[in-house]
């Protein structure tokens, strides 16, 4: 049968190569990580003992003359003079906003007669007439107001210092004209000053407009003497008076830099959104008692705008120092009680781990000078109804706390796909009005926030603030430290798996039922399963090894392993006796279920509960019991094989995940039956049960004890054609006893005959099973 593929996986009959282990370690997320508090985040402090580079003193000084800088293209800031210092370049500067202004500065050497020269301006070749009959240098300012016009000679600067200037201010572009040492400024108006970009072909300096007198002095008399030692720039005493500038929303400042590493200070305005999560567990019994109401860590991903930039952020919220409360309304089974419910108060802390996709979190490995300032937020509790079978429901309501920023450290958030270097913000709590109470009980007037409904209908709570840190990062911005590279492998794999899942699910409707049943009868093993994948025939053994390793950690394999272990222990502990039945191990497997049934009432509720508990384990019997009929495992393997053959996204690294996921998720709504003489007993995973006669399909009372005995002694049959379908088929078409038995046993030949006859009832049932084979 097709289920040979799953049986073969469960036998673990393939070796594991060291190279496969190494690849797995590099591509899979970490396992068995204990994190406290909260299952997603842990705190660690960064080392701060590395050697510093160049360190500025505490006085911020804006130099008069900043530079020199290499030729470049950029959008210069407003209110800063660009002091141009050419050597012998013919084109000094090009500037335009591509709407109403095009400016070019040309340099002409002394003693040049009237002549036409060729220049390349803004990518266009132009012939321009120039003349310089003086012994000084001349800067020709060429201007046009639209892209189709020709350049006109607008201004001339005659200079013996060979310096020119360019400034963006108010709604104009400013330059120098006249003759040194009496050159002055002039302007050209524009309606779009902010978009003016420049291409500078010479070395240049930057001077604040507040020091414009110095710029005029340099243009007319030349630059001051320069010393070629590091960090020494002649500045005027007046430059120590710094014009106040408002801090930017996002700031990346280089503190120090060497050849390989640099210290970057990141200042960020952030918006933190978080929510609480909780776990509410109800005790068994009559439905009047609750076991636990507790806080759980909660992940939240969101987007927001920061200085016009879209930011993607991720937070994890967890709590520490909770207070355990309880309520006991009485000793009777119908008395309301809560064994434990958690409340956060003044002695508690709330941790919010924050990460966003900005540069600040890209290389957060070595960090110092970490500081933050955040607002406070009030969190109020909502109502939670304790739904009891009879009587008025108790309601837990109210409660509130305020969160106040109390510190920040480094942390790591762990999600299903990636680990994130984060900042952990710690908040202390103060209790607020109103207190919380439990309506219809004696509990009232207690302060704090209970875990029953901590979000009170809010999608999230929001805190605004700002953080600053200095991080040691590679000097090359294109390089990422290995801690982030190691986790992107899993992200890429998940992206591939996502595409594969979408493709698999879309293929379900394209599979022919007759082809599926024919395929389900073939002995599909590991190697035939891979035959549809290109370029993997030679690597079949390696492929099987990878699939085997992944499958060993699946829930199905774990259940089989636990079943085998429990049966072995039971068999070894039973003394040999003639009274012991040959299937003692099977009896032990069902003993706990039988004991539960023995102590239960005959109500429909309890029978449903017990059959549901049994049916969860019937799948193991489906694997371990070989029958001649078709089962759900056969259909799962056949659908999987068909989809693998048709898929365009299958790759060797995605196949193990797909096969493992299919074993867990294909056909989740399964039904099983056992056959004894003329009676059939059937149960599904939802706890629904039927007992009926083969001849008439008349329902008879369902005996749970008899069902357990039959499961122990007889093969478990997959209900490919379930009771409702059989009854519908008999009522509309009428079927013989022989056909009924064949359909009950899931005989594939009879199924094929009904489908070939285009029977809509049988065909629809098989199509429903195929559509359940989704990832």
From Swiss-Prot:
Motif (YGL motif): 447-449
Chain ranges for the short sequence motif DGE motif as given in the UniProt record: 307-309
Record site: Cleavage: 230-231, 240-241, 246-247
Spike body and stalk (antigen domain), as annotated region: 247-478
Top-level division of the source organism's lineage: Viruses
Annotated spans, Spike head: 65-223
Coiled coil: 483-510
Family matches, as InterPro entries: ConA-like_dom_sf, Rota_A_VP4, Rota_VP4_MID, Rota_VP4_MID_sf, VP4_concanavalin-like, VP4_helical
Disulfide bonds: 317-379
Keyword Disulfide bond appears in the UniProt entry: yes
Region Spike foot: start-end pairs: 509-775
UniProtKB keywords: Capsid protein, Coiled coil, Disulfide bond, Hemagglutinin, Host cell membrane, Host cytoplasm, Host cytoskeleton, Host endoplasmic reticulum, Host membrane, Host-virus interaction, Membrane, Outer capsid protein, Viral attachment to host cell, Viral penetration into host cytoplasm, Viral penetration via permeabilization of host membrane, Virion, Virus entry into host cell
Gene Ontology BP term (one): permeabilization of host organelle membrane involved in viral entry into host cell
Pfam families linked to this entry: Rota_VP4_MID, VP4_haemagglut, VP4_helical
Cellular component GO terms held in the UniProt record: host cell endoplasmic reticulum-Golgi intermediate compartment; host cell plasma membrane; host cell rough endoplasmic reticulum; host cytoskeleton; membrane; viral outer capsid
Region (Hydrophobic): 388-408
Motif KID motif, residue range(s) on this chain: 643-645
Similarity annotation: Belongs to the rotavirus VP4 family.
More details: This strain probably does not use sialic acid to attach to the host cell.
This protein's name: Outer capsid protein VP4
């Amino acid at each position: 049968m097709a289920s040979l593929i799953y049986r073969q996986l469960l036998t673990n009959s393939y070796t594991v190569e060291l190279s496969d282990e190494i690849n797995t370690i590099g591509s899979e997320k970490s396992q068995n990580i204990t994190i406290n508090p909260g299952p997603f985040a842990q705190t660690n402090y960064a080392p701060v003992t590395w050697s510093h580079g160049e360190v500025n003193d505490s006085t911020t000084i804006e130099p008069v003359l900043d530079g020199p800088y290499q030729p470049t293209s950029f959008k210069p800031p407003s209110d800063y003079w660009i002091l141009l210092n050419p050597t012998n370049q013919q084109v000094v500067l090009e500037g335009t906003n591509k709407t109403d202004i095009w400016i070019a500065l040309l340099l002409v050497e002394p003693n040049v007669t009237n002549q036409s020269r060729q220049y390349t301006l803004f990518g266009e070749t132009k012939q321009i007439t120039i003349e310089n009959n003086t012994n000084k240098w001349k800067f020709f300012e060429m201007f046009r107001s639209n892209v189709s016009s020709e350049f006109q000679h607008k201004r001339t600067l005659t200079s013996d210092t060979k310096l020119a200037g360019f400034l963006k201010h108010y709604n104009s572009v400013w330059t120098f004209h006249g003759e040194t040492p009496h050159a002055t400024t002039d302007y050209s108006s524009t309606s779009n000053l902010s978009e003016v970009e420049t291409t500078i072909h010479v070395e240049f300096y930057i001077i604040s407009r507040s020091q414009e007198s110095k710029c005029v002095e340099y243009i007319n008399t030349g630059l001051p003497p320069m010393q070629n030692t590091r960090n020494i720039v002649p500045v005027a005493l007046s430059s120590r008076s710094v014009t106040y500038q408002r801090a930017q929303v996002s700031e990346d400042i280089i503190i120090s830099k060497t050849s390989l590493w640099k210290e970057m200070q990141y200042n960020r305005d952030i918006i933190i959104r978080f929510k609480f999560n909780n776990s509410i567990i109800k005790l068994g019994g009559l439905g009047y008692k609750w076991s636990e109401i507790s806080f759980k860590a909660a992940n939240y991903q969101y987007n927001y705008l920061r200085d016009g930039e879209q930011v993607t952020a991720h937070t994890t919220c967890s709590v520490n120092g909770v207070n355990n409360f309880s309520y006991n309304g009485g000793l009777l089974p119908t008395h309301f009680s809560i064994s434990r419910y958690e409340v956060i108060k003044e002695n508690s802390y709330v941790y919010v781990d924050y990460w966003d996709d900005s540069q600040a979190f890209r290389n957060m490995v070595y960090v110092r000078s970490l500081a933050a300032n955040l607002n406070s937020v009030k969190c109020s509790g909502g109502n939670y109804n304790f739904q009891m079978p009879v009587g008025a429901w108790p309601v837990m309501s109210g409660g509130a706390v305020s969160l106040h920023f109390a510190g920040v450290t480094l942390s790591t958030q762990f999600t299903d796909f990636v680990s994130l270097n984060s900042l952990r913000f710690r908040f202390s709590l103060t209790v607020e009005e109103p207190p919380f109470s439990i309506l219809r009980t004696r509990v009232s007037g207690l302060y704090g926030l209970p875990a029953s409904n901590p979000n009170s209908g809010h999608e999230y709570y929001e805190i605004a603030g700002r953080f600053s840190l200095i991080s040691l990062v590679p000097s090359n911005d294109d390089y990422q430290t290995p801690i982030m590279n190691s986790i992107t492998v899993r992200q890429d794999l998940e992206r591939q798996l996502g595409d594969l899942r979408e493709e698999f699910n879309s293929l379900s409707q394209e599979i022919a039922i007759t082809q599926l049943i024919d395929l389900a009868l073939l002995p599909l093993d590991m190697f035939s399963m891979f035959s549809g994948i290109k370029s993997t025939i030679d690597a079949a053994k390696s492929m099987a090894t990878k699939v085997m390793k992944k499958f060993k950690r699946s829930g199905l394999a774990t259940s089989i392993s636990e079943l085998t272990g429990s049966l072995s222990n039971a068999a070894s502990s039973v003394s040999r006796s003639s009274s012991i039945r040959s299937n003692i191990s099977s009896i032990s497997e069902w003993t706990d279920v039988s004991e539960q049934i023995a102590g239960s009432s005959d109500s429909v509720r309890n029978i449903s509960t017990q059959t549901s508990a049994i049916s969860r384990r019937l799948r193991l019997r489906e694997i371990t019991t070989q029958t001649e009929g078709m089962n759900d495992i056969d259909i799962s393997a056949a659908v999987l094989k068909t989809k693998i053959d048709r898929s365009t996204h299958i790759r060797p690294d995605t196949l193990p995940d797909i096969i493992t996921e299919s074993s867990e998720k294909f056909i989740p709504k399964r039904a099983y039956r056992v056959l004894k003489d003329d009676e059939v007993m059937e149960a599904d995973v939802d706890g629904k049960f039927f007992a009926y006669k083969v001849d008439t399909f008349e329902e008879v009372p369902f005996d749970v004890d008899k069902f357990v005995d039959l499961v122990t002694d007889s093969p478990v049959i997959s209900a490919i054609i379930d009771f409702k379908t059989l009854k519908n088929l008999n009522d509309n078409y009428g079927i013989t006893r022989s056909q009924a038995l064949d359909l009950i046993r899931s005989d594939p030949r009879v199924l094929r005959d009904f489908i070939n006859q285009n029977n809509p009832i049988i065909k629809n049932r098989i199509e429903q099973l195929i559509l359940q084979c989704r990832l």
